[in-house]
Amino acid sequence: MAFKVLCVDHVGVAVKDLALIKQHMKDILGLDPSLPDETVEDQHVTTSFFKPSPQTEACELEFLGSTTPDGPIARFIEKSNGGKNGFQHVALRVDDIEACLADLQAKEVPLIDKKWRVGAGGCHIAFLHPKATGLLLELTERPGGPSFNK
């Protein structure tokens, strides 16, 4: 393969009340967001990332709150999770997202994104269709990777 999966980057959790879950993370676990909240307008979502220790490369938790009652996250919570907060996706960090997508397309793996797009934190991201694995998987290349130099 022309790419490597480096680690689990983050786990995405869809939540009905982003402010409430942020307060729970602070009060119960003593965690503050590792990045400022970011709204992705075209996806109707606000994201809030938490990691156990800002000094490590530990896997983060991404909480996703819908900015509209009919946004993708709100629909996911209602349809897929019975109206409750829950697991939405796993993000895998890759060393070269363009090589990864080319390899997956050559293997005819179903993709939501055939080309990367900019996600939260300026990362280059793309999603595999759940038909590929039974899960929603996100591929993430962090700033500084090969696709940022093209």
Where are these regions (language model features)?
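Intrinsic disorder/low-complexity detector
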Residues: A2-L6, L20-Q23, D27-I28, D32-L35, ...
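Acidic (E/D-rich), amphipathic helical modules within compact regulatory domains
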Residues: G30-T56
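Short connector loops at helix/strand junctions that flank enzyme active sites
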Residues: V45, T56-A58, G82-F87
